[in-house]
Every structure is written in structure tokens, then in C-alpha cells.
Amino acid sequence: MATSMAAASGRFESAKSIEERKEQTRNARAEVLRQAKANFEKEERRKELKRLRGEDTWMLPDVNERIEQFSQEHSVKKKKKKDKHSKKAKKEKKKKSKKQKYEKNNESSDSSSSSEDEWVEAVPSQTPDKEKAWKVKDEKSGKDDTQIIKRDEWMTVDFMSVKTVSSSSLKAEKETMRKIEQEKNQALEQSKLMERELNPYWKDGGTGLPPEDCSVSSITKVSVVEDGGLSWLRKSYLRMKEQAEKQSRNFEDIVAERYGSMEIFQSKLEDAEKAASTKEDYRRERWRKPTYSDKAQNCQESRESDLVKYGNSSRDRYATTDTAKNSNNEKFIGDEKDKRPGSLETCRRESNPRQNQEFSFGNLRAKFLRPSDDEELSFHSKGRKFEPLSSSSALVAQGSLCSGFRKPTKNSEERLTSWSRSDGRGDKKHSNQKPSETSTDEHQHVPEDPREKSQDEVLRDDPPKKEHLRDTKSTFAGSPERESIHILSVDEKNKLGAKIIKAEMMGNMELAEQLKVQLEKANKFKETITQIPKKSGVENEDQQEVILVRTDQSGRVWPVNTPGKSLESQGGRRKRQMVSTHEERERVRYFHDDDNLSLNDLVKNEKMGTAENQNKLFMRMASKFMGKTDGDYYTLDDMFVSKAAERERLGEEEENQRKKAIAEHRSLAAQMEKCLYCFDSSQFPKHLIVAIGVKVYLCLPNVRSLTEGHCLIVPLQHHRAATLLDEDIWEEIQMFRKSLVKMFEDKGLDCIFLETNMSMKKQYHMVYECIPLPKEVGDMAPIYFKKAIMESDEEWSMNKKLIDLSSKDIRKSVPRGLPYFSVDFGLHGGFAHVIEDQHKFPHYFGKEIIGGMLDIEPRLWRKGIRESFEDQRKKALQFAQWWKPYDFTKSKNY
């Protein structure tokens, strides 16, 4: 006993320690937030200083001119493209204008020939021909001005008075015209549909339901006969209250105007309630706590009586309106016990609608009370299905009606509207019945609250929305529709199954069937919800439409096929079915999809597949199924054969390819976003650009240069290696290389070109570095590099250690997709080395050799030393002066 108490006490923890732990968590969270805020502010200050210094906008004047030239060429190309489309129209216009001009000249010549010829004496200094020509021309022009030429109306209009029209106003006019046209088409289509409409309430623009006035009158007639005018008096009370609020008058004065005095109205209401009450022992029966067997028996009997009533009902049966199903769910927060799916008290009340329809005077009395904060009146229900009154409201209900008339509040106003709510019984399939049908229920739903009316109109106008609201706002607490909205977990399903077994053992088959239906609906809902894409924060980002492609290591790109059929659902942890591989003791297939692949498909898969992919597949299968092998009887080969014969889900391969393509695209986009050498990147240093070609540009390093004149040749597009470049890009790189060699040669310097291609998966931008060296050091450079390459990397390598580039360049010496290091000495060839182990090979290998030759401190070639913006600008201006005589990008032939 003592040990059990000690064990039990060991699980307790003092409030002080709990509070201390919470305080530590709060302090740690505050510290993290403070640090993040400080880092953010520091980054913002750095960006602001960078902007003020002009690092984002300043560029060399020559580079700026080159960019403007590119933009002009681009605009000219676009203009030419536009002109090409409008060339035909212009030609036709010219032909018309020429034709009109020719006709005009013919008319003028006819008029001049018909007029009398005037002879003028010639002046000696002028020839008669010239004078005559001038005279005739003058005469023609005078006649044309007076008779023929007449200005058009548009030429005389004052353009300052003309109203200007913007493109937005034109778009708005077009949009309105389109809407008007669409409305006309809809009206024509609607009129054609109305001619064939059989429902009289749909014809002539109806809503499909009888008018509300008719329904109200019919309700009042029926209610007066059956309930002694109780519903009419309640509606009268609501109308008087609304009138008092609108006119800002006293409620008792309005009651006195209509009924003489408050006492008369109270007496009428009491008489009507007595006439409507048919069962005196309803309250006693309701508050009696039944046993479990009584509950089950009452539930079964009530359901059977409901089925009989439903079967014998005639055409006068009236189904309640749908808006009763869409009321607030707050009216069901009172009794949590009755909300459970297996609650038999709820079942009993559902199965006896006649009892739920009765209104006692005490219940009505509680409606006129001003509700307090700690008091929850349970008179609020959906339809006439009332929850049990609390003790406080039951005591108050015993008082007189006089003390019940108090100042109404907003909450009481909303709760009073539940008088007119109709019964919410029935399944979802009964909710679409016509409201013109009548039922044995005593009251019909009449929306008195204007919010209810607007809700009714919305539901009538939009049937799909109504169905959705009916599903999501189901009011029965124990109904399976309400609980099947969320996906049930495994534990919840197990508990539900236990409830089903328990109900079957107790003989409550109705409850068992209900729970089974709920479980089935939950399973179906889970299957449908898996096909809906999950919402995440990515949706807030701008969506892009891209062509999904796969790229192998050699740079080959091919588009991803879209899956022809939808992907089959996994359906839990089911075992995959085996495909028959043998027929009549002969092997007919190895893999599950052998029948679907042709020889061309197999060849394509073999060409597009790489050794890395095969190694991944082999390692995954070996690690997953190695434990299943048992020596001589089931070896590793047998495991691979049986695994290959398992059937995969339909469309699984296409879906995997699509996911890989999406992952590749995202990684490439992220790499290009933070790339230092892409023009579209936000981190691109524009002030370091020296010259821009067609597909290649020349810039300076973003860190301190190894030697004076250290520069970079970089492709404009995001290319990874020289072995993956196109011919025109490689040729332009060689043109920059020749110009740089010539420039440094005139200065008495030698230069070395380096390229390191590593980490193909990370997709770094290709950089071709040019480092100038003194002549005597440049002559010794091949010896240093040859010795360093021979001693680098693994001792035993798969590839040749040293590749000579004197006869062939790097693109013809190293296969595509392999990581490599290359060095070129001026315009002569150099050496290349295929990197065996990328993790051990340093990315600064070439710079380290040059640093050793020039005795440079290691921090310059390891990570680089940052420079200020002013130092970088001076460096760019100096290099631009050197480069200007050798800049081939400004030549006209380029």
C-alpha cells in the first residue's frame, strides 16, 4: 500500500516548479524574438545604407550605354514585329490613297481644259513655258480653293474642347456592354426555359415556392383552429415589440392600444396556451430519469410509431422548411449529455414530436425574462425540440405572467424568434420536399426576424449553397452527419467500433446501425479528403505556370509526361499484389509494367536513367528488405526478383517523376534567387560589371582580388559548366579570353584561366576566372599546376589523373556531367582533372596554387576578404580604363 502511494505521489509536481518551467519557456521565447528583431533591424539598416551609397543603381557609364542599347534593340525588334503584322493593311491603305489622288487629278485637269485659255504677254527675262505653267498652276489652285477643296468637319473641330478618353474608361465601357449582352442572352435563354416549365411557381420569374403571404394566411387559419390563436398572439407580441423599438415608445402603451391593457393580453395568452396544451403530465414525464432498458424500449417504440405515422400520412403532410436546419448552433450548448451520439434521451425526444410541440405557460413565462450571464435558458431549440429547463428558470416559471414583462434585450430578442421555428426532424433527403405540402405538425415555419427572411431568400435562390449549409450546420447533436465532418483518428474509430459491439450486445440494434453508418461515412469522407490538395502557406505566394522538365547530369532536358489516369488511393497499409511472372513454367515478364512498355520506351528509360538512380534504387531495396532474407532458402537475388514482380499503383511512376521535377524546379529557382552572377538576382553586384556581350559578360570579383586585374568571365544565363554550354556561348567566352590576353600582354603580364565545376546538384553558376601574373611566374605556372594535380585527390582514381588540353579544349576532353577542374595558360592549352571525391577536393584548388606561387596570405584565396563599396568602385573604374581600348563589344561588326 505504501509503495503504491509513493509511486502515485511520484507523479505529482509542485505548482512552483511548473511555474518556473513556464517562466523559463517565456524568457527563452522572448530572447529568441528579441534576437530575431535585432537581426532584422540590422539587415534593414545595411540595406538602407547600401541604397544610400548607390550600390544597387551605380554602374559604369559604358555598361549603362550598353544596357540602353540592348533595350532600344529590343524595342525596335518588337516594333518590327508589329509593323510586319500591319504591313498588309498599310499597303492596302496606300493603294486606296493613290487611287483617290489619281481621280482627283483627273477631275481638276478636266475642269481646267473646259475653262477658257488666257494668253499673257511674256516677260523677256522668263521663258513663256515657265510663265504659262506657273499661271496655269495658280489658276488651278485658286479654283480648287474656292470650289473643290472643302475642309472636313473634323478639321474644324476645337480639339481642346473634346473630352479625353482613357484606356480604363474604354475597358469599363466594353465590360458594361459585355455584361448587358450577357444579360440579354440569359434573359432569352430563361424565357425559352420558362415556356416548358411545369412548376407554376417557377414560371414568370418565380422562385419555385408559393408566395409568403399565402403561406402566412394558411398558417394563421390552421393555427387558429388547432392552437386557439396561440401562435397568432405570439406573432402579435413580436410585432408590437418591433413597433415599440422603431417608434421609440413604451411597450405597454402599444399593448394597451391594441388590447386595452396588459392584463387582457396576458389573459388571452393564458387561455390560448391552456387550449393548446393536450398532455398535462408532459413535464413530469420529461423530468423522470428512465432506466437504460426503458430508454432503449421507448426509443424503439417511438421510432416504430414515427414510421407508421410517416407511412399513413396523406398529401396534406407538410414538411418543414430548410431554414430551421440553418439556425445558430449556440442553442445546443446547454445539455452536453444529450449531445452524445448514443444518448437515448435525445433519441426519445426526437421520436416524440407531438410532445415537443406543446408549450407550457411556465416555459412561455421564461421567454419574457431578461437573461443573466450565469443563466442559460434551455428554451432555445431548433424547431420545437426543447432542452430541459435549468433549475433557476424552472423556479421562475412558477411566478405570474405580470412580472415576466421586462425590458427586452438583444439576446432575448434572438431567443424569442425560436417560437416560430419549425420542427427539424427528418433526414437530409426530406429537406427538399415542397413547402406546399402539409403535415400533422401544428405549426409551420414563418420567418419573423428579418435576418431569417434574408436567409430564406438566399437559400431559395442558391440550392447548392443551401445543401452545403445543411451539411455543415446540422443541428442534431447525435446525428452522424455532424460527427463525420472531421476525419476520425484510429483511436476514435476503435472506440466507435467498441460502441457498436456494446450496442449489439445490449440489443439496441437501432443505435448499432446508426453508429455503423457514421463509421462508413467517416471512411468515405477520409477517402474524398485525401484527393483534395492540402492548403498551406504556399498558396499565399504568387502561383507560376512552368513546364516541368527533368535534367540529367549531362545536361539533357526532357519534359515530364502528365499522368494519363488519376492516381489510385493507397487505401491504408495494404499489401501489394504480386503479378504473375510465369505461364506454363515459362517466364513471361520480370516487372509489373512489362506489358505496357514497348521497346522504344525501354530504350528511352535506359538512356534517360543514370548510374546514380540505379544505385539509389538498389540501396533502398537492399536496406528495406535485407532482414527478410534467410540464408540458403531466400537470398538477396530472390528478394529482388519478387520485389520487381509486385504491382505498383496506377500512375505512381508518373507521379514520382512529377514530384522530382517539381523539386528540381524549386531548388533551381531558389539557387537562382540568391545567385551572385544572375542578372535577375537581388544580390547581383551591378557596379562590378565591366562589359556586356550578347550572351557573356565581364565583371570583377566581389571580394578582394588576388592580383591587380583579377576578373571573371560569366555567362548571362544560369549555366553550370563549360561542358554544358552551347557553341555560341563558348565562342564568345573565347573572344573575351583573347582580348584579355592581349590586354595583359601589352602590360607585360601573363594570365591564367581557371574553372572549377563541383556539386552538380547545387547547380552553381559557371565562373571562368582570369588571374594575371608576372611573366617569370607565368612561365613556371604549368610545372606547379601539373605537380599539384598529380598529387591531388585519390591515390587510385577511376579516371585519368591529368588531361592535356593543348590539342583539345575542355568541352571535348571531359565527358558531360562529370565534376572537373581545368586551367588554361594564356591562349595555349592547359590541364584538366576529373574530380573523384567532391567532398575532399577543395573549391579553391587553383587559387591555392597561385597563392603559393605569389606568396599570398591564405585568407585571400580561402574565403576572400570583403571590400567596401568605394574600393570596389575604384577597382571597377581602373579596370574599365584598361579594358576600353580592347573592348570588342562596342565594334559595329560584333
From Swiss-Prot:
Residues 1-147, 270-483, 561-583 are annotated as: Disordered. Residues 13-107, 166-281, 502-530, 644-675 form a coiled coil. Residues 76-99 have a biased composition (Basic residues). The keyword Glycoprotein does not apply. It comes from the Eukaryota. GO terms for cellular component: nucleoplasm; post-mRNA release spliceosomal complex. Belongs to the CWF19 family. Residues 320-330 have a biased composition (Polar residues). Keywords: Coiled coil, Isopeptide bond, Phosphoprotein, Ubl conjugation. Residues 13-56, 128-147, 270-284, 332-352, 410-430, 440-473 have a biased composition (Basic and acidic residues). There is a cross-link at K171, K604 (Glycyl lysine isopeptide (Lys-Gly) (interchain with G-Cter in SUMO2)). InterPro entries: Cwf19-like (IPR040194), Cwf19-like_C_dom-1 (IPR006768), Cwf19-like_C_dom-2 (IPR006767), HIT-like_sf (IPR036265). This is CWF19-like protein 2. The modification Phosphoserine is found at S75, S360, S372, S479, S484.
